Amino acid sequence: MDACFSTQLIDGDGVFNVSGLENFMKEVKMGECGLSYAVVSIMGPQSSGKSTLLNHLFRTNFREMDAFKGRSQTTKGIWMAKAHNIEPCTLVMDLEGTDGRERGEDDTAFEKQSALFALAVSDIVLINMWCHDIGREQAANKPLLKTVFQVMMRLFSPRKTTLLFVIRDKSKTPLENLEPILREDIQKIWDGVPKPHAHKETPLSEFFNVEVVALSSYEEKEELFKEQVASLRDRFQQSIAPGGLAGDRRGVVPASGFSFSSQQFWKVIKENKDLDLPAHKVMVATVRCEEIGNEKIASFTADEEWQQFEEAVQHDYVPGFGKKISNLLDRCLSEYDMEAIYFDEGVRTSKRHQLESKLLQLVNPAYQNILDHLRTRTLEVFKESFDKSLEKEGFAVAARDCTKVFLEKFDKGSEDAAIQQVKWDPSKIKDKLKRDIEAHVASVRAKKLSELCSKYEGQLTKALAEPVEALLDSASEETWPAIRKLLQRETKSAVSGFESAMASFELDEVTQKELLSKLESHGKSVVESKAKEEAARVLIRMKDRFSTLFSRDADSMPRVWTGKEDIKAITKTARSASMKLLSTMAAIRLDEDGDNIENTLSLALVDTARPGTTDRSIQSFDPLASSSWERVPEEKTLITPVQCKSLWRQFKAETEYTVTQAIAAQEANKRNNNWLPPPWALAAMAILGFNEFMTLLKNPLYLGVIFVVFLVGKAMWVQLDIAKEFQNGFLPAVLSLSTKFVPTIMNILKRLADEGQRPAAPERQREMELQPKSTRNGSHSNVTSAGSSSITSSESGPEYSSPIAH
């Protein structure tokens, strides 16, 4: 009997025992029953043996009346227990007896409330009645039946309740005779009960299945009573099966919602409101399905496998995420379906959708993390693969192929992460990946193009810089045409190579033109940069050119100022060349547009030295008094006219010293070469020495002596090379001649003595003897032997050689 878990459901004051019912539900494991359960309640007069009948019929342990202590109220309120060894699970409710003296005749409220509650929750209602009351007008069961029928009008139930009339203390009258009388009495009571207008003509059979059973007296025929009860017990086995006592299962509340349903029933009954069982069924289903859904959400959140997934997706991509999460969701929803299967379908489905939506809300952040990790991983692998592809393929082909491959990989990865229960669209993440890939491709393209541009710009710079510098250094009329030709040739070569290298990028025409134009502009900028550099050094270049032309002759040999050179003409030529260099460097001439810079500079700077030019310059407008050149744009101007004028003034000032030094050197050379007395001295000598001159002419001896002296002097002049010695200065010449004078005199005298002692010989033999000596001694009369001397002849006269010991 202990397995019946007897519990007071509602006490005598009408207070519902919520905690007691919850414990009872757990003890009997009602949550596992679903719709496979039945509720049986019993009504009847007080002390009519209701509890005794239930205890024998269902083997419960309800408190029974002790006949030896007198008849009094035993059951207060409503009690509940579980029938023992009856399938399906059967709940038994023992109601407080009617017409008890404890409540009095006027207190029928609780009777009606408990009756209504029993009809609302029960599948089978046992009406316990005395056999001797059948057919009596004032029978004890009539008020009870009236109460049952009256409260039934307040129940809007779609199902029929089974009323099982249990006739107690059966007499000798057969049941076949008693049953028609009982049914007739029941019909009369039904007809006499006030009904709503909609049910004025509704027969009793629409609301109840009436069954009648008779039992012998428990006190007088206990064994027979027990046999009859055992037979009746068999009818409660599988009572919910079709044809059973509780065969009509329409509107039944699932077992898991029984507790809440009972509470709500009693609450509405206590508020004296009509019970709309269909609406109540929906309400119970709504609350219970909501509870089941919340339980499943809590269960899903606490699931260890889900927590592991949730943690894993925070850090990296998880393969098979979609399938695994789908299985978890399926399991959770299946559990919900199993627990909520017996509730109202509409409510169940609605709450299932809500549960699914909430579960998906829980899963969505993890799904988004998976896609983000997939996008990040795909992008990283794309970058590596793209870099490798660039080593084998052209840029555009590699970018196109890699983009296609990795977008397809993302699609496969997103399919792997897809959850079966929902069709989340990964297109936004894919679009972001596509934008990231395009941004990376654009970045690499820009980098590669920049490297390519730098490469060809470097080549162009290398091809132009030094040649342009050399051409600008030469600074002639052909300088800028040569630079233009060089620029055109090298730019064309660079553009051709750059264009071929760009082909793999498959750039649009506009971009190609921009890059090619940039390369062409770079070539011009190199030339312009070099021109500006050279323009900054133009003064140095001008001085170098002037120095080169002024200090060196046409054969690039150092110029010696002997006195015969035209320094003025040389200076003008050198300055004109420097002026041409200045005019060349004054402007950038990459276009073939003509200008008059050279003419302007020539007129303003060089031609001012001509007679009459100075006066005209003073009277007319200065062409260099301007900040720009005629027909030359400002951006092409390297040196303005005013700057040219200033540079020329500085140039002249810094080269004036060189010219002055040349003039001084020429004058000094002239002085050194002029060893004759001044003309006035010669005139004085002629006047004052006229008498002596006439004496010499009149005396032949003097003339002979003078002739000999002339020959000796001539020989000394040639032998000592006096003219050359004096070119080195007066004092050095005197010192050099003083050391050579005596040896030379001795050499000459010795040679004359030798010549006088030799016999006369033919002239030809003499020439042959003298020729080797002349060749051996050389044009500078170098010493060949310490004790020999010879006399040679040349075109300029006899030449004497004197040996000098080395």
Curated annotation (Swiss-Prot):
<feature type="compositionally biased region" description="Low complexity">
    <location>
        <begin position="784"/>
        <end position="806"/>
    </location>
</feature>
<dbReference type="GO" id="GO:0005525">
    <property type="term" value="F:GTP binding"/>
</dbReference>
<dbReference type="InterPro" id="IPR046758">
    <property type="entry name" value="Sey1/RHD3-like_3HB"/>
</dbReference>
<keyword id="KW-0472">Membrane</keyword>
<dbReference type="InterPro" id="IPR027417">
    <property type="entry name" value="P-loop_NTPase"/>
</dbReference>
<feature type="coiled-coil region">
    <location>
        <begin position="214"/>
        <end position="239"/>
    </location>
</feature>
<feature type="transmembrane region" description="Helical">
    <location>
        <begin position="677"/>
        <end position="697"/>
    </location>
</feature>
<feature type="topological domain" description="Lumenal">
    <location>
        <begin position="698"/>
        <end position="700"/>
    </location>
</feature>
<feature type="binding site">
    <location>
        <begin position="44"/>
        <end position="51"/>
    </location>
    <ligand>
        <name>GTP</name>
    </ligand>
</feature>
<feature type="domain" description="GB1/RHD3-type G">
    <location>
        <begin position="34"/>
        <end position="249"/>
    </location>
</feature>
<keyword id="KW-1133">Transmembrane helix</keyword>
<protein>
    <recommendedName>
        <fullName>Protein ROOT HAIR DEFECTIVE 3</fullName>
        <ecNumber>3.6.5.-</ecNumber>
    </recommendedName>
</protein>
<dbReference type="InterPro" id="IPR030386">
    <property type="entry name" value="G_GB1_RHD3_dom"/>
</dbReference>
<dbReference type="Pfam" id="PF20428">
    <property type="entry name" value="Sey1_3HB"/>
</dbReference>
<comment type="function">
    <text>Probable GTP-binding protein that may be involved in cell development.</text>
</comment>
<keyword id="KW-0378">Hydrolase</keyword>
<feature type="topological domain" description="Cytoplasmic">
    <location>
        <begin position="722"/>
        <end position="806"/>
    </location>
</feature>
<dbReference type="GO" id="GO:0005789">
    <property type="term" value="C:endoplasmic reticulum membrane"/>
</dbReference>
<dbReference type="GO" id="GO:0016320">
    <property type="term" value="P:endoplasmic reticulum membrane fusion"/>
</dbReference>
<dbReference type="Pfam" id="PF05879">
    <property type="entry name" value="RHD3_GTPase"/>
</dbReference>
<feature type="transmembrane region" description="Helical">
    <location>
        <begin position="701"/>
        <end position="721"/>
    </location>
</feature>
<keyword id="KW-0812">Transmembrane</keyword>
<keyword id="KW-0256">Endoplasmic reticulum</keyword>
<feature type="region of interest" description="Disordered">
    <location>
        <begin position="756"/>
        <end position="806"/>
    </location>
</feature>
<feature type="coiled-coil region">
    <location>
        <begin position="446"/>
        <end position="466"/>
    </location>
</feature>
<dbReference type="GO" id="GO:0003924">
    <property type="term" value="F:GTPase activity"/>
</dbReference>
<keyword id="KW-0342">GTP-binding</keyword>
<feature type="compositionally biased region" description="Basic and acidic residues">
    <location>
        <begin position="756"/>
        <end position="770"/>
    </location>
</feature>
<dbReference type="GO" id="GO:0005783">
    <property type="term" value="C:endoplasmic reticulum"/>
</dbReference>
<feature type="compositionally biased region" description="Polar residues">
    <location>
        <begin position="772"/>
        <end position="783"/>
    </location>
</feature>
<feature type="topological domain" description="Cytoplasmic">
    <location>
        <begin position="1"/>
        <end position="676"/>
    </location>
</feature>
<dbReference type="InterPro" id="IPR008803">
    <property type="entry name" value="RHD3/Sey1"/>
</dbReference>
<keyword id="KW-0547">Nucleotide-binding</keyword>
<comment type="similarity">
    <text>Belongs to the TRAFAC class dynamin-like GTPase superfamily. GB1/RHD3 GTPase family. RHD3 subfamily.</text>
</comment>
<keyword id="KW-0175">Coiled coil</keyword>
